[in-house]
Every structure is written in C-alpha cells, then in structure tokens.
Amino acid sequence: MTIEEAKQHILEGGKITEEQALSLANHPDKEALYEAAHQITRHFMGNKFDTCSIINAKSGNCSEDCKWCAQSGHYKTLVNLYPLLPAKECVYHAVYNRKQGIRRFALVTSGKRVSDKELEQITDTIRQIKRQSDIKCCASMGLLTRSQLQSLYDSGVENYHCNIETAPSYFRQLCSTHTIEQKMETIHTAREIGFRICCGGIIGMGETMKERIEMACFLQKEGVLSIPLNLLQPIPGTPMENTQILEEEEWLTTIALFRLINPNAFLRFSGGRAQLSEVTQRKSLHIGINSAIIGDLLTTIGSKVEEDKVLFTSEGYSLTENTDWEK
C-alpha cells in the first residue's frame, strides 16, 4: 500500500492494519507521509484545537515501580514530596486556568490509587471547583475501584485519564507492580460508569516502531478519542535516566502513524515536548497534534499558556470551547 493509497483509504472511512502502518513507517518519503497525516487531520478534525491543564495534587512516594517515573518511591529522584493538596489551592488553580481560556482542569495524584479518605477530600474539592467555575473537571488517580470511580463521577468529574503508557506487549518490561490488564479494567469500569476516557502513553522508552503502532491500534480499537502523547524526558535517579532521547524525525513519524490509525482522535501534546525544537513542535502540529496540556506539568517543565496559544493559532488552529470527544 502506497502512502497515497493509505490516505485515500482512510479518507473514505477505512482502517489500516498494523502491518500496513509499519510499511508506511519505513517509507523513505517522510514528507509525503507527514502531508498525508496533515490532510487526514484536517478532513476529520478540522482546525479545532483542544486545551486542558493539570495540577499535581499529590506528589511522590508512589508504591509502583514504573521505570520512567520521578514519583516512584523505588527510586531516588529530586521530585517534590507532598500529600494531597488542600481544596483551596486546587480551586484557585482551576479558576485561574479557566480565566486563561482553558477548557478542562485535571487533578492528578501519585500512587497506585488514592485512599477512600483522600477521595472524600477530592470529591469535596471537585464540588467546590464546580461551584466557582464552569471549567470541566478531569481526574487521573490510578487504578480506582468501581465504588471510588462512581463517587468521583457523582462529584462532577466527567473525564477519567489512565494511560496504557506503551504497547500492551511491552508494558511488563517497564513496570512489575501492576499489569496492563489492571489498567484496562479501570478504563472499562470508568467508561461503564459514564466517564469519557483519556488514554495515551510515552514515546521513547526503548520500544520499537512496531510496538508504537501496536499501542496506536490498541487505542483505536478501544475507541479512545483523547490520546496524550508524551516524549520521554529521562529523569535522573530512575532506571531510564540514561535513555537516549528520541530522534525528532522518529517522533514526527510516530505522530503521523498515530494520526493515520486514529483519524478521529485528539492527539495531545503532553510531557517532554520542551525537548523538541520549535521547528519540530510546529511540524508536529502540522502533522496531527491538535490538542495540548498547557501550563505546568507533573515533574517536568511545562509551557507558558499565552506563548502556546500563539504557537497553536499560528499553525492554523482555532482554540475551541467545544470538542467532539466531550459529546
């Protein structure tokens, strides 16, 4: 299948296989691949650009051993350690972000899951946010139980985030304290309750292009419409501290393939993009990135909101209040 044939097939509503995607990844004409992804982005998603922000509401001392993560208690890193933030601080940040035109605000906590006592504080915080702002609330709190997810949903959280992080076949190489099956159980339960799902991963953790394609196809089959894509930023003290940063062309090829495989999804700039040159960031936006977490991130440098808005609009996007994945 040529790049042109793949593009036309997708534009007509077809899907490409993992084998076809891998063949396209190896095609020497990268610019043609990038342009095909751009046309698919515009055809299915228009020029809408979706923004969200997060707050690291509980940091460090995590029981899990994810090899990339600064917050794992298994490794000695320079991450700040603190318990669950008080409601007042979270509410302040939510209101502040909404005033900057950001659509959604996520509370993110370290750990395998929050305790029931912590969840009581979190749901109270969410209700306070909803009383003081019209910002939409999201949460990323690990492998919550069904009853915990239900309480979170009832408090006003609409979207639940749980990354699969990498290809299902590769996950066990990166984490031994929980499984991809546990992640998927959480995601399926959250969806059954009524949450919209945000799920993606980290690129550049030693996985092959074939495994990235596996992840992209897995997310497509799961019907995920918000896919955060992080670029690994090696954290000193973690097992991945000496991992070589991904070549920018390989990152761009990955974005193009995620777009071809997930034509209807918001592909979201997330952690690590500050490592990319401005040229590559702009090219990522041209190819298929059409959403972003903006502001401060969890344990890496985030972005300045106004500078990001200029960047996104200069690449032809319109910052929108309404995004299809929220319907």
UniProtKB/Swiss-Prot annotation:
[4Fe-4S] cluster binds at residues 62, 66, 69. It is an enzyme of class 2 (transferase). CDD domains: Radical_SAM (cd01335). The keyword Transferase applies. This is Biotin synthase. Homodimer. Binds 1 [4Fe-4S] cluster. The cluster is coordinated with 3 cysteines and an exchangeable S-adenosyl-L-methionine. Keywords: 2Fe-2S, 4Fe-4S, Biotin biosynthesis, Iron, Iron-sulfur, Metal-binding, S-adenosyl-L-methionine, Transferase. The keyword Chaperone does not apply. GO terms for molecular function: 2 iron, 2 sulfur cluster binding; 4 iron, 4 sulfur cluster binding; biotin synthase activity; iron ion binding. [2Fe-2S] cluster binds at residues 138, 198, 268. Belongs to the radical SAM superfamily. Biotin synthase family. Its EC number is 2.8.1.6. PROSITE patterns: RADICAL_SAM. Its cofactor is [4Fe-4S] cluster; [2Fe-2S] cluster. Pfam families: BATS, Radical_SAM. Residues 44-273 form the Radical SAM core domain. Pathway: Cofactor biosynthesis; biotin biosynthesis; biotin from 7,8-diaminononanoate: step 2/2. Catalyzes the conversion of dethiobiotin (DTB) to biotin by the insertion of a sulfur atom into dethiobiotin via a radical-based mechanism. The gene is bioB. It catalyses: (4R,5S)-dethiobiotin + (sulfur carrier)-SH + 2 reduced [2Fe-2S]-[ferredoxin] + 2 S-adenosyl-L-methionine = (sulfur carrier)-H + biotin + 2 5'-deoxyadenosine + 2 L-methionine + 2 oxidized [2Fe-2S]-[ferredoxin].
